[in-house]
UniProtKB/Swiss-Prot annotation:
Belongs to the Toxin_15 family. Transmembrane segments: none annotated. PANTHER family: ANKYRIN REPEAT FAMILY PROTEIN, PROTEIN PHOSPHATASE 1 REGULATORY SUBUNIT. This is Ankyrin repeat protein A. The keyword Repeat applies. ANK repeats lie at residues 381-410, 429-458, 477-506, 525-554, 573-602. It comes from the Bacteria. The keyword Ribonucleoprotein does not apply. It comes from Escherichia coli (strain K12). Keywords: ANK repeat, Repeat.
Length: 728
């Protein structure tokens, strides 16, 4: 464990030097000592001596101790020159000087290249399964135990466990022994905390923010201010850097001597039984510390640490008890993060809308290539920021992105290709953000996207093919996103999408073929989503589609035959959804369709030619669903079909001959519906068919029709026979 406390001898040196150089800052004095050392002058260098003895290397070109930070970088103005930046944490002063490369090389040689005094131990959870080993990933605190990938423990799990210990232990301090070995940690680890970090991010607590790693101390100081004003002595937070997670613990300690100490401890799951702690008697001193001051990795992890931690932004998400949730409201409103892809990714992930809105305005001034990179905002595992925002349910973030891009200030700033790349926000498997939102049943996110899409399409002049591709939300090997909605019976989500279509048709000029394709929602193999909805008895899905058709017809020319094709679309097995609904007895689906017949007649001019396919529901072998219902003893289905014909025959213009044609319709096996019922011994269904025919003959006045008389006599004669196997 590393503890940073003031050293009296070092403070004395600084004070003595400051007294002899009243008009120079300590940063300037430090630089003067470096120059003197480089030139070979035999002069005292107390600042350099103390720094060399107490500093550690935080990056390839970064050194620091409790008072100073030295950074080396390439000069922005002179590519052949180097720059040295000296930051004095106590005075809050910064000095930058252009130097020759040989000067940098000399200083790099005299400063310690790494800290060998730290007690570091890699987290190394070994497999108990000897027969099959899986690779362990040391970086990012990720390992497999007991040897299977599905049992992996990643850094966010360990960081969350550490926070639990902070609040659960009596002294608000985790017992480091619990983290000292793989065995002890696994004994201590609570598997319930595996989803805790994700839940914390999704809950969007007050005080969350994204800051430059160099401004980490500023955020800690802001938290200490709120803690003091609310009388709270301990709090914890999760730190997210790229896809790595750490834990920070803040503590205000009042000593018996009347002093107040402000303590910041950072625990990194990359190492065990170790944390770095900085203590100060002044909150103002805390704000000078960077996250790099708390990093404790050995040389083998140094490059990873530089690339993915200390040189990036950090998301800080307070983890407070429920009664303290509002304590940090407004505490970090003044924190301005750097404009970088890492920042944008974290802002979208944690739902920090205030900071994101400010950066979206700044993006308009950047070149398109950089602007696209910022808005796509991939992290190191190729997940775009917008995808993460959708994953965590940050509807306001999604709305900010889409609405900002819809403003005239962005018109012409992005090519259509780059814009679609940003909006689709695909993961590494090619699934878009819209696909994710609909799959997660996140109505708020989907509504935000669909509401903003018409204006965005108008601003950037997107054509109907681009909008259609966005709405279909599929990759080259996936099903249409609405296929999953219909198959799973998510009527509310389907209604949200269909309600947005009329405006999209009007503004984006979607064609009838594109709209009907969205409604059919086929999977990769061509099976329609509506087929599965009917097969599974999801009548709400059928109802939502039927209710949406009239409003869609006002925008595009949908015909009666189009609707019949939609309702009778076939699966790979060449059955229709209505065929399967009749076979399985899904009365709710059948009633929903037949109850909509008057509306279909009035709106789409349905006639008897359109009605008959719905009554019979043939499969590709011309075998009717009505006959399949008879075969499977679905008496209610048979009764409903004949009742629908009886109720609507006059409306649809059926004549006596049409009715008799329906009654005498034969399957490929040459049976009529009555004969099939009789053949299978379903006498009740056979009598139902006969009685319905008699009622319709009386109602329509064709009791003297020769076809009717002959059919009636034939059916009555069959019913009087003892054996069913006597059909003609």
């Amino acid at each position: 464990m590393i503890t940073r406390i003031p050293r009296s001898s070092f403070s004395a040196n600084i004070n003595n030097t400051a007294q002899t150089n009243e008009h120079q800052t300590l940063s300037e004095l430090f630089y003067k000592e470096l120059e003197d050392k480089f030139s070979g002058k035999e002069l005292a260098t107390p600042l350099l001596k103390s720094f060399s003895e107490n500093c550690r290397q935080n990056g390839r070109h970064i050194f620091s101790n409790k008072d100073f930070v030295i950074k080396f970088s390439t000069s922005v103005l002179q590519a052949d020159k180097k720059e040295i930046t000296i930051i004095n944490k106590n005075e809050n002063t910064t000095l930058t000087q252009t130097i020759a490369p040989i000067f940098e090389k000399y200083l790099m040689e005299i400063l310690p290249q790494r800290s060998d005094t730290l007690d570091k131990q890699e987290l190394n959870l070994k497999s108990d399964r000897k027969e099959k080993e899986f690779p362990r990933i040391k970086l990012n605190g990720q390992c497999y135990f007991p040897g299977r990938p599905q049992n992996r423990i990643v850094c966010r799990h360990i960081a969350a466990q550490y926070i639990n210990d902070i609040y659960q232990n009596v002294d608000y301090k985790p017992h480091q022994d619990d983290y000292s070995s793989a065995e002890k940690f696994l004994t201590h680890f609570n598997k319930k905390c595996k989803n805790q970090t994700l839940a914390l991010v999704s809950s969007r607590p007050e005080g969350r923010c994204v800051a430059a790693c160099g401004d980490f101390g500023l955020v800690m100081k802001a938290y200490f201010d709120k803690m003091e004003s609310n009388g709270i002595s301990v709090m914890a937070a999760i730190l997210l850097v790229d896809n790595h997670a750490l834990t920070v613990r803040l503590r205000i300690k009042n000593t018996t001597e009347g002093c107040t100490h402000y303590v910041v401890s950072v625990y990194d799951p990359n190492v065990t039984n170790d944390k770095i702690r900085i203590m100060s008697e002044s909150k103002e001193n805390i704000k000078h510390y960077s996250l790099m001051d708390f990093m404790n990795v050995d040389y083998s992890l140094l490059k990873w640490s530089n690339d993915h931690v200390i040189n990036q932004s950090v998301a800080i998400i307070p983890a407070l008890p429920k009664e303290q949730l509002l304590m940090l409201k407004g505490s970090v409103d003044e924190i301005t993060p750097p404009l970088s892809p890492a920042t944008m990714n974290l802002l979208m992930a944690i739902g920090q809308n205030h900071q994101l809105t400010q950066l979206m305005i700044q993006l308009q001034k950047m070149p398109e290539l950089h602007r696209t990179e910022m808005l796509t905002a991939y992290n190191s595992i190729n997940l775009p920021g917008l995808y993460l925002a959708i994953n965590y349910g940050n509807a306001d973030i999604v709305e900010t992105i889409f609405n900002s891009l819809s403003e005239t200030g962005y018109e012409g700033l992005l090519s259509k290709k780059n814009l679609m790349h940003i909006l689709e926000a695909k993961d590494k498997n090619g699934f878009s953000g819209l696909f994710l939102a609909i799959s997660r049943k996140d109505k708020n996110v989907v509504t935000s996207i669909l509401n903003a899409l018409p204006k965005l399409a108008a601003t950037h002049h997107l054509d109907n093919e681009q909008v259609y591709k966005f709405l279909s939300a599929k990759n080259r090997t996936s099903s249409h996103v609405l296929y999953h909605v219909m198959a799973n019976g998510d009527a509310d989500m389907l209604k949200i999408v269909l309600n947005a279509l009329p405006l999209l048709i009007r503004t984006c000029h979607l064609t009838k073929e594109q709209v009907l394709d969205l409604l059919k929602a086929k999977d990769f193999y061509g099976c329609p989503g509506l087929y599965l909805a009917m097969q599974n008895g999801h009548s709400d899905i059928v109802k939502v589609i039927l209710e949406a058709l009239p409003s869609l017809a006002q925008e595009i020319n949908i015909s009666a035959s189009d609707i019949v094709d939609l309702l009778t679309a076939k699966s790979l097995a060449r059955d229709t959804g209505l065929f399967m609904a009749m076979q399985r007895g899904h009365m709710n689906v059948i009633n929903t369709i037949f109850n909509a017949l008057p509306t279909l007649f009035n709106t789409f001019k349905f006639d008897k030619k359109n009605m008959k396919p719905l009554l019979l529901a043939n499969n590709s072998n011309e075998y009717p669903g009505l006959f399949s219902a008879i075969q499977h003893k679905q008496q209610n289905v048979v009764e409903t079909v004949y009742l629908a014909l009886s109720d609507h025959a006059r409306l649809f213009g059926f004549t006596a001959e049409d009715i008799m044609d329906f009654w005498q319709h034969k399957a490929p096996q040459k049976y009529s519906a009555f004969e099939l019922a009789f053949e299978f011994g379903h006498r009740v269904i056979a009598e139902l068919i006969l009685n319905t025919l008699n009622k319709m003959a009386e109602s329509f006045g064709f009791t003297d029709n020769p076809r009717y008389i002959a059919e009636k006599n034939y059916m009555e004669a069959l019913l009087k026979k003892a054996s069913p196997h006597t059909v003609r």
